[in-house]
Amino acid sequence: MSFRREKFIEFGGPDGGNGGNGGSVIFVASSAVNTLLYFRYNQHIRAENGKAGSGKGKFGAAGRNRVVEVPVGTQLYDEDGNTLIADLNNIGQQYTVAAGGRGGIGNAQYKSSTNRAPTYFTYGTLGEEHCVLLKLKIVSDVGIIGMPNAGKSSLLSRCTASKTKVSDYPFTTLEPHLGVAYANGCELVLADIPGLIENASSGAGLGHKFLKHIERCVILLHLVDCSLPDIVSAYELVRQELKLHSQELTGKQEVVILNKCDLLSEGEVREKQKLLESSTKKEVITLSMGDELDSLIVFLHAQVKKAVVTEPSDTSFDPFLYVHYNKK
């Protein structure tokens, strides 16, 4: 509230300006970040308050918005973690988590023909305050799946510049890794999903943490270790866990590769290839350590372009998943 006070002006009248609107908290999907680690140490995010109005009819400045970059694939849930609020799938997509309050109204706005000197004003409204849960699902063209020690990390490191850990023991990979492969003008994002074991759909071997990321992959690249005594059972075990987790996963297009063929003779490889093709009713590709991969990348790129992406349905909560992203 303010009144005009100047020399030789006896009845200056009201001149209190309006207050500025408060800033909003906005989340924006960005390729510049790939983890939610920022929120581990910044759990309370505030935008700037609007400035107060002043005399001479001056309006207060609006508060600046607080824009927070989040990885592409971030999902926002309500406080209970049951209701999906927003799904930021595309670069630049944004969502206003909490809108700023409206600025107050100065007494100059209440001047009328019957009230030439109003002594009242209106306070501004409070901004919104929300508690949201964040979950990150990796988004990739190809999800590399299979049992532990099937050679998934080795394939990713050969196709891309990914620095994933590669060793000859199960569960070498304990978190998803992304890599970008290039061949003959084709660009492909591959995700190394940690190995799936029996009862993964029930949470065994951190199954829930891994299976949910497969939902965002366009197609699946299923690696089967050629050296296993029963390759059909190994294949069917992984497929069963996908089915138990979500029927949508079983509908995704799948490319089957018989890996580590250099460990067996050509005759043994051919026999196992026919056995797996007979069981899966799909064409099975054989792969050895020394094989060139450009043709495989081009083939996968073509399959991705033809595939239909299914919408995810998972609503579990994993706030601080760390995703490694490597670009060749």
UniProtKB/Swiss-Prot annotation:
<dbReference type="GO" id="GO:0042254">
    <property type="term" value="P:ribosome biogenesis"/>
</dbReference>
<keyword id="KW-0479">Metal-binding</keyword>
<keyword id="KW-0547">Nucleotide-binding</keyword>
<feature type="binding site">
    <location>
        <begin position="171"/>
        <end position="175"/>
    </location>
    <ligand>
        <name>GTP</name>
    </ligand>
</feature>
<keyword id="KW-0378">Hydrolase</keyword>
<dbReference type="InterPro" id="IPR006169">
    <property type="entry name" value="GTP1_OBG_dom"/>
</dbReference>
<dbReference type="InterPro" id="IPR014100">
    <property type="entry name" value="GTP-bd_Obg/CgtA"/>
</dbReference>
<protein>
    <recommendedName>
        <fullName>GTPase Obg 2</fullName>
        <ecNumber>3.6.5.-</ecNumber>
    </recommendedName>
</protein>
<feature type="domain" description="OBG-type G">
    <location>
        <begin position="140"/>
        <end position="309"/>
    </location>
</feature>
<dbReference type="InterPro" id="IPR006073">
    <property type="entry name" value="GTP-bd"/>
</dbReference>
<keyword id="KW-0460">Magnesium</keyword>
<dbReference type="InterPro" id="IPR031167">
    <property type="entry name" value="G_OBG"/>
</dbReference>
<feature type="binding site">
    <location>
        <begin position="146"/>
        <end position="153"/>
    </location>
    <ligand>
        <name>GTP</name>
    </ligand>
</feature>
<dbReference type="GO" id="GO:0003924">
    <property type="term" value="F:GTPase activity"/>
</dbReference>
<dbReference type="InterPro" id="IPR045086">
    <property type="entry name" value="OBG_GTPase"/>
</dbReference>
<dbReference type="InterPro" id="IPR006074">
    <property type="entry name" value="GTP1-OBG_CS"/>
</dbReference>
<keyword id="KW-0963">Cytoplasm</keyword>
<comment type="function">
    <text>An essential GTPase which binds GTP, GDP and possibly (p)ppGpp with moderate affinity, with high nucleotide exchange rates and a fairly low GTP hydrolysis rate. Plays a role in control of the cell cycle, stress response, ribosome biogenesis and in those bacteria that undergo differentiation, in morphogenesis control.</text>
</comment>
<dbReference type="Pfam" id="PF01926">
    <property type="entry name" value="MMR_HSR1"/>
</dbReference>
<feature type="binding site">
    <location>
        <position position="173"/>
    </location>
    <ligand>
        <name>Mg(2+)</name>
    </ligand>
</feature>
<feature type="binding site">
    <location>
        <position position="153"/>
    </location>
    <ligand>
        <name>Mg(2+)</name>
    </ligand>
</feature>
<feature type="binding site">
    <location>
        <begin position="192"/>
        <end position="195"/>
    </location>
    <ligand>
        <name>GTP</name>
    </ligand>
</feature>
<feature type="domain" description="Obg">
    <location>
        <begin position="1"/>
        <end position="139"/>
    </location>
</feature>
<dbReference type="InterPro" id="IPR036726">
    <property type="entry name" value="GTP1_OBG_dom_sf"/>
</dbReference>
<comment type="similarity">
    <text>Belongs to the TRAFAC class OBG-HflX-like GTPase superfamily. OBG GTPase family.</text>
</comment>
<dbReference type="Pfam" id="PF01018">
    <property type="entry name" value="GTP1_OBG"/>
</dbReference>
<keyword id="KW-0342">GTP-binding</keyword>
<feature type="binding site">
    <location>
        <begin position="259"/>
        <end position="262"/>
    </location>
    <ligand>
        <name>GTP</name>
    </ligand>
</feature>
<dbReference type="GO" id="GO:0000287">
    <property type="term" value="F:magnesium ion binding"/>
</dbReference>
<dbReference type="InterPro" id="IPR027417">
    <property type="entry name" value="P-loop_NTPase"/>
</dbReference>
<feature type="binding site">
    <location>
        <begin position="290"/>
        <end position="292"/>
    </location>
    <ligand>
        <name>GTP</name>
    </ligand>
</feature>
<dbReference type="GO" id="GO:0005737">
    <property type="term" value="C:cytoplasm"/>
</dbReference>
<comment type="subunit">
    <text>Monomer.</text>
</comment>
<dbReference type="GO" id="GO:0005525">
    <property type="term" value="F:GTP binding"/>
</dbReference>
